[in-house]
Amino acid sequence: MVALGHYLTLGAILFALSVIGIFLNRKNLIVLLMCIELMLLAVNLNFVAFSHYLGDMAGQVFVFFILTVAAAESAIGLAILVVLFRNRSTINVDELDTLKG
């Protein structure tokens, strides 16, 4: 059986990789969205690990609700990205900072 520390280490590594990905790649909006989703999945892994370790199902149910909200968030983010690409012909973050209402 895999110990709790292994899951927490994996979650910390995934979280750190996503933070590094956000800081290293600030130009591509798709990569930024993927790094944010990876960060959320790392937190969810820690929720599931603690939930299993403590024998409580509340953490796993909470992760289920987080994943449904994250799926809706991803769909909305990608829809906004498609509209921005149609209007500006780019997904470069540096060129999208001057949005007009």
UniProtKB/Swiss-Prot annotation:
GO terms for molecular function: NADH:ubiquinone reductase (non-electrogenic) activity; quinone binding. Keywords: Cell inner membrane, Cell membrane, Membrane, NAD, Quinone, Translocase, Transmembrane, Transmembrane helix, Transport, Ubiquinone. It catalyses: a quinone + NADH + 5 H(+)(in) = a quinol + NAD(+) + 4 H(+)(out). It is found in: Cell inner membrane. It comes from the Bacteria. The keyword Transit peptide does not apply. One of its GO terms (biological process) is ATP synthesis coupled electron transport. Pfam families: Oxidored_q2. It is an enzyme of class 7 (translocase). The keyword Zinc does not apply. The chain crosses the membrane at residues 4-24, 30-50, 61-81. It is a multi-pass membrane protein. Its EC number is 7.1.1.-. GO terms for cellular component: NADH dehydrogenase complex; plasma membrane. NDH-1 shuttles electrons from NADH, via FMN and iron-sulfur (Fe-S) centers, to quinones in the respiratory chain. The immediate electron acceptor for the enzyme in this species is believed to be ubiquinone. Couples the redox reaction to proton translocation (for every two electrons transferred, four hydrogen ions are translocated across the cytoplasmic membrane), and thus conserves the redox energy in a proton gradient. NDH-1 is composed of 14 different subunits. Subunits NuoA, H, J, K, L, M, N constitute the membrane sector of the complex. NCBIfam families: PRK05715.1-2 (NF004320), PRK05715.1-3 (NF004321), PRK05715.1-5 (NF004323). Belongs to the complex I subunit 4L family. This is NADH-quinone oxidoreductase subunit K. It comes from Leptothrix cholodnii (strain ATCC 51168 / LMG 8142 / SP-6) (Leptothrix discophora (strain SP-6)).
